[in-house]
Amino acid sequence: MEIKDIKAVYLVGAGGIGMSAIARYFLSKKLVVAGYDKTPSNLTHELEKEGMLIHYEENVDLIPEACKDAKNTLVVYTPAIPAEHKELVYFRENGFTIEKRAQVLGTLTRTHKGLCVAGTHGKTSTSTMCAHIMHQSHLDCNAFLGGISKNYGTNYILSDKSDFVVIEADEFDRSFHWLRPWMSVITSTDPDHLDIYGTKEAYLESFRHYTELIQPGGALIIHKDLEMKQHVQDGVKIYEYSQDEGDFHAENIKIENGGITFDFISPIENVTGIELGQPVPINITNGVAAMAMAQLNGCTADELRNGMKTYGGVDRRFDFKIKNDKLVFLSDYAHHPKEIYQSAKSIRELYKNRKNTAIFQPHLYTRTRDFYKDFANSLSLLDEVILCDIYPAREQPIPGVTSKLIYDNLKPGVEKSMIHKEDVLGLVKSRDFDVLVVLGAGDLDNYVPEITKILESK
């Protein structure tokens, strides 16, 4: 179904961060947009305020009449929705056009110049950073992001004048194979989603195939330390980047007085005096990749400087809630061992002489089973680790797989404990912290506003 032929859109799994951006896109086109989600959230409430019709019961009778015409209704679903979902079955049996979120984004990369960011981790921050640079430049852009931009308060940026669309390319369920990027950054390929891929080799092969999809005339910007093999089409340029080496990299890095500055080294034009608006060490590497893609498409040196200086970050990505001499409290979506490592390393670099404590909620039984030793090694960079029960998301429990696997493998010297998430607020009330971070992609983040209030009241 062509986008121009659509009159109504129904989203199954409307409250997901990626799906909500699709909802906002179609709402901006003045279409009827409705959908289902399992539970209400701040995001679904925001969508309802913006005009979307959402219900929270798996019930075909609750589908609006405006979304029951198969000829002009597009149904979009997330891979997390089971195939036997009653509403999905209804649409399938009645001949509706049903597409994954990634298929919709793939259509947009055929009508716009898609600037895509893929990778196990780093893709949300890098894509949001690139979108901000582009949006405030003379080029402008549309953007479908995997997190809520602090600059815009949304995960979707609309431009009526730009041919560029920045997209976070999701490797889960091989969704990014629907895209046809003009250019792409690949930030990392540390194995993940082994419940889907089975093996590390299959995971890396999925990224290799993704590189084949970049359009001739475009470019691949790949982190130089990745072990994957790219296989681009003729006419696609390949650039390497990292913090310290590659075609694009940083020099003269200075981390002092709570700020970070560096020079951006580029085969096109070096740009001195880059200042990070969100001064987190990992954002040096993310910034190099974001600036590389923006510069390759025509952003000027001043636009790069301004974009990086005014970049405000992403909700739940090294997201400071309290930051003063007595207490630092932040929330971070990190849920893969390498992400945990980067988060812990950044905290260590920023707060060398302070006690660093993490409350971590592991995400998925399969991920915990596959990587519990890696989680323990990464968390052991911190002084204290408080482990919550595993957040199951779409999964059923696996016998013998609990947070204790991580607990038992933490290195000697690390203070450690286990707690139910319902007891977290009581713990925070009962003791003092120096630097505290809530880690994970589960629902522990719902407690962050209350934790913030408790800590501020002390």
Predicted features and spans:
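Conserved hydrophobic helix-helix packing surfaces used for dimerization/oligomerization
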Residues: 8-9, 75, 115, 141, ...
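Short internal beta-strands
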Residues: 31-38, 220-224, 357-360, 382-392
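C-terminal helical cap/extension that packs against the catalytic core
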Residues: 50, 237, 376-434
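Nucleotide phosphate-binding/pyrophosphate-handling subdomain across enzymes
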Residues: 2-8, 18, 25, 29, ...
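N-terminal leader/targeting and accessory segments in enzymes
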Residues: 1-100, 104, 219, 249, ...
